[in-house]
Each structure stands twice: as structure tokens, then as C-alpha cells.
């Protein structure tokens, strides 16, 4: 839209184009459920975080798959976002979501984009599964997720946020968004909340909520682990 002065010269201009946001499939590289479980290894020795560094032994533990993401025809970029999850930067440390120009989120754990797509992948898969069982009303909304959050603390949290839920995954120790157990545990607090809004405030209910979140997270991780342990 052009706004002209009385003499016919340009005063200002507005871009009124409305660019479509299109869901599409993108190739992703993730852990299933983490790099140690498929190896039947415990944390220690060479199997440590090492300040987010990638390691040769990890290369075989990345899984290639595909998941729904958003393509913006205006920017020509792909965003780690779909109808269920939106990766965003809510808390410190600052890490803007990755936005590649091709439908491929192929990062390793030394890059911030890995946690972004790892969280989106597992939350989407888990929600798709419970929806297939007929519970499609649970968390039938878009949760905003920060995969580098909690001000660097070794902690993660689901926040009801007045009906606009968020999940913040901490980066202390091993980044929590690298581990499907933690990803799904926090998301399941949202599932419980959506099943009974405002009903999980009491101490007893909160304790039960933690147990349920652990159960579903463990069940999910076992289901995607080739060794089933």
C-alpha cells in the first residue's frame, strides 16, 4: 500500500502481503532416546558431556528421521515449529531457534539446533501416539519450548502460563533437551494439566504428577530403544 502526499510524492509504504505458513516434512537427526541407552552404557569415562562436544562414539547413535516443521514462503526458511510445538527463546542463555533454508535439521549436539529439533521431534511423536489412541484432546494446542533455558541450571520445568503453556529445558550438566526421558517427562506435566486444568496444585497431586510423568517418559523411551531396556 502506498500513501502519497498531496503533491503526489511518496509519504510511506506498507507491505500488506500475507505470506502463507505451510507445514512440511523435514529431515532431522536426533537421539533415540539418548546416546547411552542404545549402547547399554552408563555415564562416565569417555561417555560424558564434555561441555557439549561431539565425540566419535556418538556418530553411530544419531538417528535420521523426518518430522513436521513450518515453512514460511515469505522468508523462504524452515522453522522448528508445527501445530504442537514452537521452539522459541524464552529464558537465558540466549539461543535463537535455528531456521535453515532447506528442509534439513541435521545438527550434532555441539550445535544449538540439535536440541531444538530433538525436542520438537520427540514431543510431536509422543503427542501423535496418544492422539492415535483417541486422546486427541490432550495438549491439543501449541506449546512454546525453550531448549536452552533455566539460566544454565540443571533443571527443566513445565509452566501452565495462564493457559498458554511453556516448557523450559535447562543446560546445566548434559543439556536436558538431548534426552527423550526429560523431554517427555516435562511434556507429560502438560498432558496431565490439560486433562484436569488447575487440578495439579496440591502436594499429593503434584507427587502423583511426577510419578505419572516418569512412567510415561520411561515407557516412551523404552518403546523407541532398539534394546528395549
PLM region descriptions:
Residues 1-183, 190-229:
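Zymogen propeptides/activation segments of proteases
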Amino acid at each position: 500500500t502506498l500513501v502519497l502526499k498531496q503533491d503526489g510524492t511518496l509519504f510511506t509504504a506498507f507491505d500488506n502481503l500475507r505470506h502463507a505458513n505451510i507445514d512440511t516434512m523435514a529431515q532431522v537427526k536426533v537421539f533415540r532416546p539418548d546416546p547411552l541407552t542404545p549402547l547399554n552404557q552408563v555415564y562416565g569415562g569417555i561417555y560424558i558431556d564434555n561441555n557439549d562436544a561431539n565425540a566419535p562414539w556418538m556418530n553411530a547413535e544419531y538417528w535420521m528421521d523426518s518430522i513436521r516443521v513450518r515453512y514460511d514462503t515469505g522468508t523462504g526458511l524452515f522453522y522448528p515449529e508445527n501445530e504442537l510445538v514452537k521452539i522459541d527463546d524464552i529464558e537465558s542463555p540466549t539461543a535463537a531457534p535455528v531456521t535453515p533454508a532447506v528442509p534439513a535439521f541435521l545438527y550434532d549436539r555441539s550445535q544449538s539446533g540439535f536440541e531444538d529439533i530433538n525436542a520438537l521431534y520427540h514431543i510431536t511423536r509422543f503427542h501423535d501416539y496418544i492422539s492415535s489412541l483417541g486422546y486427541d484432546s490432550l495438549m491439543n494446542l501449541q506449546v512454546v519450548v525453550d531448549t536452552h533455558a533455566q539460566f544454565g541450571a540443571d533443571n527443566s520445568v513445565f509452566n501452565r502460563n495462564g493457559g498458554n503453556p511453556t516448557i523450559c529445558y535447562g543446560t546445566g550438566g548434559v543439556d536436558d533437551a538431548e534426552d527423550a526421558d526429560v523431554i517427555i517427562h516435562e511434556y507429560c506435566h502438560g498432558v496431565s494439566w490439560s486433562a484436569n486444568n488447575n487440578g495439579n496444585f496440591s502436594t499429593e497431586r503434584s507427587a502423583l504428577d511426577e510419578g505419572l510423568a516418569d512412567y510415561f517418559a520411561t515407557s516412551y523411551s523404552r518403546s523407541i530403544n532398539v534394546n528395549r531396556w
